[in-house]
Amino acid sequence: MEARVILIATTNKHKIEEINEVLQSCGYRVEPAAASKLEVQSNRLEDVAAYAAIQAYLALQRPVIVEDAGLFVEALGGFPGPYSSYVFKTIGIRGLLKLLEDVENRRAYFKSVIALAHSGGVEVFTGTVHGVIAEKPRGDRGFGYDPVFIPEGSSKTFAEMETQEKNKFSHRGKAARELCRWLRQYGPPR
């Protein structure tokens, strides 16, 4: 049986690969949509993803998902949180590590939100993984903060893991599994 396609409003090949690796288990796959991702500024990832998904649905007139994620560092009061992408583009991993110089508490968590917009409304799925920020970058896989995030239960950073291994731990993998459960229960969105 051929996998059913759901559009995703991203061109990030790493996100697409990670989400597809999970969705294949429920007979779906995502393909990038030719829609610009409009973001609203909010302290809540759920609001950002839901707004962007609704805008993409209105533009495409087809079911579409948007994934947004953030890294929340305990010692920095949850920073960069929903602004993780902007912070990564401006100060990068080096800047984050500089902020954590001489900081003992390196606990952090990644949160992923997948919003599915369809004719019946918007569904929001979340996944969270707790871990710590490494002292220095390790690994060459993945993207973003993957080289410095070590999930609980592992000694490797996300950037040292293959996609399949990363999805066992990852916030995005957990959110995608929630989406899969919804798709199994309710069938293909319209």
Swiss-Prot record:
Keywords: Hydrolase, Magnesium, Metal-binding, Nucleotide metabolism, Nucleotide-binding. Homodimer. The active site is at residue 68. One of its GO terms (cellular component) is cytoplasm. It comes from the Archaea. SUPFAM superfamilies: ITPase-like. Mg(2+) binds at residues 39, 68. Binds 1 Mg(2+) ion per subunit. Its cofactor is Mg(2+). Pyrophosphatase that catalyzes the hydrolysis of nucleoside triphosphates to their monophosphate derivatives, with a high preference for the non-canonical purine nucleotides XTP (xanthosine triphosphate), dITP (deoxyinosine triphosphate) and ITP. Seems to function as a house-cleaning enzyme that removes non-canonical purine nucleotides from the nucleotide pool, thus preventing their incorporation into DNA/RNA and avoiding chromosomal lesions. NCBIfam families: PRK14821.1, RdgB/HAM1 family non-canonical purine NTP pyrophosphatase. Gene3D superfamilies: 3.90.950.10. It catalyses: XTP + H2O = XMP + diphosphate + H(+); dITP + H2O = dIMP + diphosphate + H(+); ITP + H2O = IMP + diphosphate + H(+). One of its GO terms (biological process) is purine nucleoside triphosphate catabolic process. Its EC number is 3.6.1.66. It comes from Hyperthermus butylicus (strain DSM 5456 / JCM 9403 / PLM1-5). One of its GO terms (molecular function) is ITP diphosphatase activity. This is dITP/XTP pyrophosphatase. Pfam families: Ham1p_like. Belongs to the HAM1 NTPase family. HAMAP family: Non_canon_purine_NTPase. Substrate binds at residues 10-15, 69, 143-146, 166, 171-172. InterPro entries: dITP/XTP_pyrophosphatase, ITPase-like_fam, RdgB/HAM1.
